[in-house]
Amino acid sequence: MSRPAAPDDVDTICAALPETWFGTSWGDVPTWLVPHRVRDGEKKGRGFVLYRRPHKTAVDPATGEMYDDLLVIRTANDDDKRALVEADGPFFTIPHFNGYNAVLVQLSRLGEISRDELAEVITDAWCACAPKSLVKTYLSDRG
C-alpha cells in the first residue's frame, strides 16, 4: 500500500492523465477537464474533478458549517457512486448531488485513503468523462 493521500496529490494525479487541463466549469469553479468536443475552433472540456466552493447545499452535519474544502469527483454510474459512499472511507454525497454521478470528499480527509486509492478513483473519473478512444488507448498502453 502506498502512503496516505494528500491534497497536493489531486493535481499531480489529474495532470498525469492524458489530455487534461486545469480550467473552470459552471462559471468559475476550478476544474480538471478532459476533451469533450471542439466548437468554433475552441476545445470544450468535461470536468472530472472539481474544487467546490462553500455552498449552502453542503453543510457539515456535525457543525452546521458549510464545507470549505470539498472535492467533487465524477463516477461512471450510480453503482460506482454508491460503492464509494458505502465503503469505509471519506467519500460521501449530499441531496444536491442526487441523480448526479459524483462523490464528494473533503481535502482534509484524503489521508484516510492511500495515494494509490485516490489515483484509482480519479483515473476512473477521467475514464468516465474522456472520449472512449482516448480511454481505450490509455488503458491498453498501461497493460
Predicted segment positions?
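Charge-dense, helix-prone N-terminal extensions
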Residues: M1-G143
